[in-house]
Protein backbone atom coordinates (compact mmCIF):
# COMPACT_ATOMS: atom_id res chain seq x y z
CA UNK A 1 0.00 0.00 0.00
CA UNK A 2 1.30 3.49 -0.86
CA UNK A 3 2.08 5.53 2.24
CA UNK A 4 3.20 8.70 0.44
CA UNK A 5 1.79 11.83 2.03
CA UNK A 6 2.31 15.32 0.69
CA UNK A 7 2.21 17.17 4.02
CA UNK A 8 4.70 17.10 6.89
CA UNK A 9 2.04 16.87 9.58
CA UNK A 10 -1.70 16.95 10.23
CA UNK A 11 -1.68 20.69 10.93
CA UNK A 12 -0.21 21.42 7.49
CA UNK A 13 -2.73 19.00 6.01
CA UNK A 14 -5.52 21.20 7.39
CA UNK A 15 -4.06 24.67 6.87
CA UNK A 16 -2.78 24.35 3.30
CA UNK A 17 -6.14 23.22 1.81
CA UNK A 18 -7.89 25.97 3.80
CA UNK A 19 -5.66 28.72 2.42
CA UNK A 20 -5.92 27.07 -1.03
CA UNK A 21 -9.69 27.64 -0.86
CA UNK A 22 -9.12 31.24 0.28
CA UNK A 23 -6.94 31.83 -2.80
CA UNK A 24 -9.61 30.44 -5.12
CA UNK A 25 -12.04 33.06 -3.81
CA UNK A 26 -9.59 35.70 -5.04
CA UNK A 27 -9.53 34.37 -8.60
CA UNK A 28 -12.61 36.45 -9.40
CA UNK A 29 -13.92 33.72 -11.70
CA UNK A 30 -16.53 30.99 -11.64
CA UNK A 31 -14.80 27.68 -10.99
CA UNK A 32 -15.57 24.01 -10.72
CA UNK A 33 -13.27 21.66 -8.80
CA UNK A 34 -12.83 18.19 -10.27
CA UNK A 35 -11.22 15.05 -8.83
CA UNK A 36 -10.10 12.66 -11.57
CA UNK A 37 -9.20 9.13 -10.49
CA UNK A 38 -6.46 7.30 -12.39
CA UNK A 39 -3.72 4.71 -12.12
CA UNK A 40 -1.51 6.98 -10.00
CA UNK A 41 -4.17 8.33 -7.67
CA UNK A 42 -6.61 11.24 -7.75
CA UNK A 43 -5.67 14.36 -9.70
CA UNK A 44 -7.38 17.59 -8.69
CA UNK A 45 -8.28 20.02 -11.47
CA UNK A 46 -9.75 23.53 -11.33
CA UNK A 47 -12.03 24.15 -14.31
CA UNK A 48 -12.87 27.72 -15.29
CA UNK A 49 -13.38 29.96 -18.29
CA UNK A 50 -15.52 29.80 -21.40
CA UNK A 51 -16.64 26.25 -22.20
CA UNK A 52 -17.19 27.22 -25.83
CA UNK A 53 -13.54 28.16 -26.29
CA UNK A 54 -10.51 25.89 -26.93
CA UNK A 55 -9.14 23.96 -23.94
CA UNK A 56 -6.04 25.28 -22.16
CA UNK A 57 -4.34 22.96 -19.66
CA UNK A 58 -2.09 24.58 -17.03
CA UNK A 59 0.70 23.07 -14.91
CA UNK A 60 2.37 24.67 -11.87
CA UNK A 61 5.87 24.16 -10.44
CA UNK A 62 7.36 21.99 -7.70
CA UNK A 63 6.25 22.94 -4.18
CA UNK A 64 3.41 24.97 -5.64
CA UNK A 65 -0.26 24.42 -6.47
CA UNK A 66 -2.79 25.57 -9.04
CA UNK A 67 -4.63 27.93 -6.68
CA UNK A 68 -1.51 30.02 -6.04
CA UNK A 69 0.11 29.67 -9.45
CA UNK A 70 -2.76 31.05 -11.54
CA UNK A 71 -4.32 33.59 -9.15
CA UNK A 72 -3.41 36.51 -11.44
CA UNK A 73 -3.95 34.68 -14.73
CA UNK A 74 -7.04 32.48 -14.53
CA UNK A 75 -9.71 35.16 -14.94
CA UNK A 76 -8.14 36.75 -18.03
CA UNK A 77 -7.18 33.45 -19.66
CA UNK A 78 -10.69 32.20 -18.99
CA UNK A 79 -12.05 34.94 -21.26
CA UNK A 80 -10.31 33.25 -24.19
CA UNK A 81 -10.07 29.57 -23.21
CA UNK A 82 -11.75 26.72 -21.39
CA UNK A 83 -9.15 26.45 -18.63
CA UNK A 84 -8.09 23.32 -16.73
CA UNK A 85 -5.55 24.14 -13.98
CA UNK A 86 -3.99 20.91 -12.72
CA UNK A 87 -2.62 20.13 -9.26
CA UNK A 88 0.44 17.98 -9.90
CA UNK A 89 0.09 14.61 -8.22
CA UNK A 90 2.64 14.43 -5.40
CA UNK A 91 2.51 18.22 -5.02
CA UNK A 92 0.98 20.25 -2.16
CA UNK A 93 -2.36 20.92 -3.87
CA UNK A 94 -5.46 18.74 -3.58
CA UNK A 95 -4.27 15.82 -5.73
CA UNK A 96 -3.85 12.60 -3.74
CA UNK A 97 -1.22 9.96 -4.64
CA UNK A 98 -2.54 6.40 -4.86
CA UNK A 99 -0.98 2.95 -4.72
CA UNK A 100 0.31 3.28 -8.29
CA UNK A 101 2.31 6.41 -7.50
CA UNK A 102 5.76 4.88 -7.09
CA UNK A 103 9.12 4.77 -8.87
CA UNK A 104 7.39 3.55 -12.04
CA UNK A 105 5.47 6.84 -12.29
CA UNK A 106 5.74 8.50 -15.70
CA UNK A 107 4.51 12.04 -16.31
CA UNK A 108 3.49 11.46 -19.92
CA UNK A 109 1.22 8.54 -19.00
CA UNK A 110 -0.30 10.53 -16.13
CA UNK A 111 -1.06 13.54 -18.34
CA UNK A 112 -2.45 11.46 -21.22
CA UNK A 113 -4.76 9.54 -18.91
CA UNK A 114 -5.90 12.79 -17.29
CA UNK A 115 -6.68 14.42 -20.64
CA UNK A 116 -8.57 11.34 -21.78
CA UNK A 117 -10.69 11.28 -18.63
CA UNK A 118 -11.41 14.99 -19.01
CA UNK A 119 -12.59 14.26 -22.55
CA UNK A 120 -10.00 16.57 -24.11
CA UNK A 121 -8.56 15.96 -27.56
CA UNK A 122 -6.36 18.69 -29.02
CA UNK A 123 -5.30 21.24 -26.44
CA UNK A 124 -3.24 24.32 -25.72
CA UNK A 125 -0.82 23.87 -22.83
CA UNK A 126 1.15 26.17 -20.54
CA UNK A 127 3.28 25.75 -17.45
CA UNK A 128 5.68 27.47 -15.08
CA UNK A 129 9.03 26.12 -13.81
CA UNK A 130 8.55 22.34 -13.51
CA UNK A 131 5.24 22.92 -15.25
CA UNK A 132 7.26 24.39 -18.11
CA UNK A 133 9.21 21.14 -18.30
CA UNK A 134 5.97 19.11 -18.31
CA UNK A 135 4.65 21.33 -21.09
CA UNK A 136 7.81 20.92 -23.19
CA UNK A 137 8.01 17.17 -22.59
CA UNK A 138 4.37 16.50 -23.42
CA UNK A 139 4.51 18.67 -26.55
CA UNK A 140 7.57 16.76 -27.77
CA UNK A 141 6.04 13.36 -27.06
CA UNK A 142 2.53 14.19 -28.30
CA UNK A 143 2.80 16.84 -31.05
CA UNK A 144 -0.48 15.70 -32.59
CA UNK A 145 -2.33 16.53 -29.37
CA UNK A 146 -0.72 19.85 -28.37
CA UNK A 147 -1.64 22.68 -30.74
CA UNK A 148 0.76 25.17 -29.15
CA UNK A 149 2.46 25.54 -25.79
CA UNK A 150 3.92 28.25 -23.57
CA UNK A 151 6.62 27.60 -20.99
CA UNK A 152 7.41 30.21 -18.36
CA UNK A 153 10.48 30.32 -16.10
CA UNK A 154 11.92 27.32 -17.90
CA UNK A 155 13.61 26.55 -21.21
CA UNK A 156 14.26 23.19 -22.93
CA UNK A 157 17.42 21.55 -21.59
CA UNK A 158 19.58 19.21 -23.64
CA UNK A 159 20.22 15.69 -22.35
CA UNK A 160 23.20 15.58 -19.99
CA UNK A 161 24.52 13.02 -17.55
CA UNK A 162 24.99 15.79 -14.99
CA UNK A 163 21.66 17.54 -15.56
CA UNK A 164 19.96 16.19 -12.41
CA UNK A 165 22.99 16.98 -10.26
CA UNK A 166 23.23 20.48 -11.74
CA UNK A 167 19.52 21.07 -11.12
CA UNK A 168 19.85 20.06 -7.46
CA UNK A 169 22.88 22.32 -7.07
CA UNK A 170 20.96 25.24 -8.55
CA UNK A 171 17.98 24.58 -6.24
CA UNK A 172 20.25 24.63 -3.20
CA UNK A 173 21.90 27.88 -4.28
CA UNK A 174 18.55 29.59 -4.70
CA UNK A 175 16.56 28.24 -1.76
CA UNK A 176 19.22 28.01 0.95
CA UNK A 177 19.55 29.09 3.67
CA UNK A 178 16.13 30.77 3.82
CA UNK A 179 14.12 27.59 3.16
CA UNK A 180 15.72 25.88 6.17
CA UNK A 181 14.37 28.52 8.55
CA UNK A 182 11.14 29.80 6.97
CA UNK A 183 10.31 32.70 9.29
CA UNK A 184 8.32 35.60 7.86
CA UNK A 185 11.60 37.48 7.40
CA UNK A 186 13.30 34.60 5.57
CA UNK A 187 10.27 33.90 3.38
CA UNK A 188 10.32 37.58 2.43
CA UNK A 189 14.05 37.33 1.64
CA UNK A 190 13.50 34.25 -0.51
CA UNK A 191 10.71 35.95 -2.44
CA UNK A 192 12.97 38.95 -3.05
CA UNK A 193 15.75 36.60 -4.19
CA UNK A 194 13.47 34.85 -6.70
CA UNK A 195 11.74 37.88 -8.21
CA UNK A 196 12.32 41.21 -9.92
CA UNK A 197 11.10 44.60 -8.67
CA UNK A 198 7.44 43.52 -8.56
CA UNK A 199 7.98 41.12 -5.63
CA UNK A 200 4.93 42.80 -4.07
CA UNK A 201 2.73 40.49 -6.17
CA UNK A 202 3.60 37.96 -3.46
CA UNK A 203 4.15 40.13 -0.40
CA UNK A 204 1.36 42.73 -0.55
CA UNK A 205 -1.40 40.11 -0.70
CA UNK A 206 -1.63 38.59 2.76
CA UNK A 207 -3.45 35.46 1.54
CA UNK A 208 -0.80 34.83 -1.12
CA UNK A 209 2.08 35.41 1.30
CA UNK A 210 0.65 33.15 4.01
CA UNK A 211 -0.07 30.35 1.56
CA UNK A 212 3.44 30.63 0.11
CA UNK A 213 4.87 30.34 3.63
CA UNK A 214 2.62 27.39 4.48
CA UNK A 215 3.87 25.55 1.40
CA UNK A 216 7.46 26.14 2.51
CA UNK A 217 6.83 24.92 6.04
CA UNK A 218 4.26 22.19 5.49
CA UNK A 219 4.89 20.53 2.11
CA UNK A 220 6.91 17.32 2.07
CA UNK A 221 9.12 17.78 -1.01
CA UNK A 222 10.10 14.11 -1.05
CA UNK A 223 6.56 13.39 -2.30
CA UNK A 224 7.68 14.70 -5.71
CA UNK A 225 10.67 12.38 -6.07
CA UNK A 226 8.79 9.96 -8.33
CA UNK A 227 8.67 12.68 -11.01
CA UNK A 228 11.64 12.35 -13.36
CA UNK A 229 13.10 15.30 -15.27
CA UNK A 230 14.74 14.01 -18.44
CA UNK A 231 16.73 16.18 -20.84
CA UNK A 232 15.88 16.39 -24.53
CA UNK A 233 17.84 15.56 -27.66
CA UNK A 234 18.67 18.32 -30.14
CA UNK A 235 16.16 16.83 -32.55
CA UNK A 236 13.45 16.98 -29.88
CA UNK A 237 14.23 20.62 -29.07
CA UNK A 238 14.17 21.52 -32.77
CA UNK A 239 10.72 19.91 -33.01
CA UNK A 240 9.38 22.66 -30.71
CA UNK A 241 10.25 25.36 -33.25
CA UNK A 242 6.72 26.29 -34.33
CA UNK A 243 4.83 25.09 -31.27
CA UNK A 244 6.55 26.55 -28.21
CA UNK A 245 6.94 30.05 -26.78
CA UNK A 246 9.33 30.46 -23.84
CA UNK A 247 8.87 33.45 -21.52
CA UNK A 248 11.70 33.96 -19.04
CA UNK A 249 12.86 36.72 -16.71
CA UNK A 250 16.41 38.01 -16.64
CA UNK A 251 16.10 38.34 -12.84
CA UNK A 252 15.14 34.66 -12.52
CA UNK A 253 17.91 33.20 -10.32
CA UNK A 254 17.82 29.91 -12.22
CA UNK A 255 18.27 31.75 -15.52
CA UNK A 256 20.96 33.96 -13.99
CA UNK A 257 22.93 30.88 -12.93
CA UNK A 258 23.10 29.95 -16.61
CA UNK A 259 24.31 33.45 -17.45
CA UNK A 260 25.31 34.52 -20.94
CA UNK A 261 26.15 30.91 -21.76
CA UNK A 262 22.49 29.96 -21.49
CA UNK A 263 21.40 32.71 -23.87
CA UNK A 264 24.11 31.72 -26.33
CA UNK A 265 23.08 28.07 -26.09
CA UNK A 266 19.46 28.98 -26.82
CA UNK A 267 20.48 30.81 -29.98
CA UNK A 268 21.48 27.54 -31.61
CA UNK A 269 17.85 26.45 -31.57
CA UNK A 270 15.04 28.05 -33.63
CA UNK A 271 12.95 28.65 -30.52
CA UNK A 272 10.71 31.60 -29.78
CA UNK A 273 12.09 33.06 -26.54
CA UNK A 274 11.00 36.30 -24.89
CA UNK A 275 13.21 37.70 -22.11
CA UNK A 276 11.64 40.14 -19.64
CA UNK A 277 14.33 42.34 -18.12
CA UNK A 278 12.75 42.99 -14.73
CA UNK A 279 11.06 39.67 -13.99
CA UNK A 280 12.13 36.67 -11.94
CA UNK A 281 10.99 33.11 -11.37
CA UNK A 282 7.46 34.22 -10.49
CA UNK A 283 7.12 35.81 -13.90
CA UNK A 284 3.41 35.11 -14.39
CA UNK A 285 2.69 36.80 -11.04
CA UNK A 286 5.16 39.66 -11.43
CA UNK A 287 4.16 40.50 -15.00
CA UNK A 288 0.66 39.03 -15.08
CA UNK A 289 -0.92 41.41 -17.60
CA UNK A 290 1.98 41.13 -20.05
CA UNK A 291 2.20 37.36 -19.70
CA UNK A 292 -1.55 36.92 -20.14
CA UNK A 293 -1.42 38.93 -23.36
CA UNK A 294 1.58 37.00 -24.69
CA UNK A 295 -0.21 33.69 -24.06
CA UNK A 296 -3.45 34.82 -25.70
CA UNK A 297 -1.66 36.34 -28.70
CA UNK A 298 0.58 33.30 -29.26
CA UNK A 299 -2.31 30.87 -29.07
CA UNK A 300 -4.58 33.00 -31.24
CA UNK A 301 -2.73 31.75 -34.32
CA UNK A 302 -3.35 28.12 -33.40
CA UNK A 303 -6.13 26.13 -35.00
CA UNK A 304 -8.10 23.25 -33.51
Annotate each language-model stretch with its function.
Residues 245-279:
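Conserved loop-alpha-helix segment in the C-terminal half of the alpha/beta-hydrolase fold
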Residues 1-56, 80-81, 121, 300-304:
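Alpha/beta-hydrolase fold catalytic core
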Residues 140, 148-178:
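Flexible "cap/lid" loop of the alpha/beta hydrolase fold
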Residues 269-304:
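Catalytic active-site module of serine/aspartate enzymes centered on a nucleophile-bearing elbow/loop
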Residues 127, 131, 135:
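Gly/Ala-rich beta-loop-alpha elbow adjacent to hydrolase catalytic centers
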Residues 84-126:
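Active-site loop/oxyanion-hole signature of alpha/beta-hydrolase fold enzymes
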Residues 160-162, 180-239:
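Conserved alpha/beta-hydrolase catalytic His-Asp/Glu region
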Residues 41-93:
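Conserved HGGG/HGGXW glycine-rich cap/lid loop of the alpha/beta-hydrolase fold
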